[in-house]
């Protein structure tokens, strides 16, 4: 199965631009999207609505990862460190999601 999520550039409707992203902007957006997920779950929304809100959170996480790369972090090292942390906490993998970044900025 091949899944695609976009690394966003700019929004032509709202004039948001991820080239000048900041941790404050990401924090605010993450809080907004998190609240929308919580609301959808509490209201027992249809699962499609919950999925849409969860993917919005995922999109903000991608923004954060991109900002880390811009600040000099290596995603491979970060992912490896994260996976080791989970294994050390006793988690066993069920499957693996491979991420391929088509173009780097």
Predicted regions and their residues:
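Flexible "arm" and connector segments at domain edges
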Residues: 1-105
């Amino acid at each position: 199965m091949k899944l695609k999520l976009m690394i966003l550039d700019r929004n032509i409707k709202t004039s948001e631009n991820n080239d000048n992203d900041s941790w404050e902007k990401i924090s605010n957006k993450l809080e907004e999207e998190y609240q929308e997920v919580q609301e959808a779950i509490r209201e027992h929304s249809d699962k499609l609505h919950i999925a849409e809100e969860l993917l919005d959170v995922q999109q903000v996480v991608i923004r954060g990862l991109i900002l880390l790369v811009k600040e000099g972090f290596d995603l491979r090292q970060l992912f490896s460190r994260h996976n080791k942390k989970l294994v050390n906490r006793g988690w066993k993998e069920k499957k693996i999601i491979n991420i391929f970044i088509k173009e780097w900025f």
